[in-house]
Amino acid sequence: MGKLESSPDVYRFSEHYLPWHAHITAVTVAPEARRLGIGRLLTEQLEVAADAGDAWFVDLFVRVTNHKAITFYKNMGYSVFRVVKDYYGEHSTDPSQSSEDAYDMRKPMKRDVKREHVREDGEKHEVDPSDVW
């Protein structure tokens, strides 16, 4: 599941402003249907829609421990843009629960000729969940 979106214009001058882009909300393939190219096909279709909609990039969030997904997306041209500390977990409602960081991964689309919305050293850029909206 994915969508095209941007941050509200009122935040245009914020360092966390997100211009027009596509966002992968979830890609889920049944275990018995994995490794058949279905996830790649679904992701590529969102990328086609992103280019057709003149988006700057496609982004997604993935747990830093989900090595299979990270490898999958890197093989498709995505890179880590930033690390979102404590993105996953029940720590906000139950402090006794542990949390987990997320990678915000991005792939530039045709519009981003200068690659302004991706970076090579994203693992070094950490933000809090409150910086991601």
Protein language model features and the residues they cover:
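Conserved GNAT acetyl-CoA-binding A-motif
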Residues: 50-62, 72
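Acetyl-CoA-dependent GNAT
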Residues: 1-34, 40-54, 83, 106-116, ...
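Short glycine/proline-centered loop/turn elements that form peptide/ligand docking sites
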Residues: 43, 66-69, 85-92
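Conserved catalytic-core motifs of GNAT/GCN5-like acyltransferases
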Residues: 59-61, 74, 79-104
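Charge-rich, low-complexity terminal tails
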Residues: 97-101, 112, 121
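Internal amphipathic alpha-helical segments of the cytochrome P450 catalytic fold
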Residues: 35, 69-70
